[in-house]
Amino acid sequence: MAANDATSSEEGQVFGCHKVEEWNEYFKKGVETKKLVVVDFTASWCGPCRFIAPILADIAKKMPHVIFLKVDVDELKTVSAEWSVEAMPTFVFIKDGKEVDRVVGAKKEELQQTIVKHAAPATVTA
């Protein structure tokens, strides 16, 4: 399916992960490219999630160097449990396969600030 191909045309979007395989593919892409991955753990019945979704989509358009994923906690229960998600929305910030930060709740300013904070390229210390 062309919609699942990892191509540059995907930049600036929020990608929905509806299967564990899709999650694994995008997670691996984030690790391999050393990009920041922002995961929006959401639920269809969550009002604050619906409020923040267009804001996240707008941020994604402005930051194509960041991978934005959306995971429905009811669809991917194992992924949600693996990342200890207990409230929605929860935004998990991942670099090199590890969680570097988290924002719980539809907090627009905190979400934007945290993305900017972690989207900067990592400085090499040797």
UniProtKB/Swiss-Prot annotation:
One of its GO terms (molecular function) is protein-disulfide reductase activity. The record marks G47, P48 as: Contributes to redox potential value. It holds the Pfam family Thioredoxin. The active site is at C46, C49. Participates in various redox reactions through the reversible oxidation of the active center dithiol to a disulfide. The H form is known to activate a number of cytosolic enzymes. It is found in: Cytoplasm. The lineage of its organism: Eukaryota, Viridiplantae, Streptophyta, Embryophyta, Tracheophyta. Belongs to the thioredoxin family. Plant H-type subfamily. The keyword Ion transport does not apply. It comes from Nicotiana tabacum. NCBIfam families: thioredoxin. This is Thioredoxin H-type 1. One of its GO terms (cellular component) is cytoplasm.
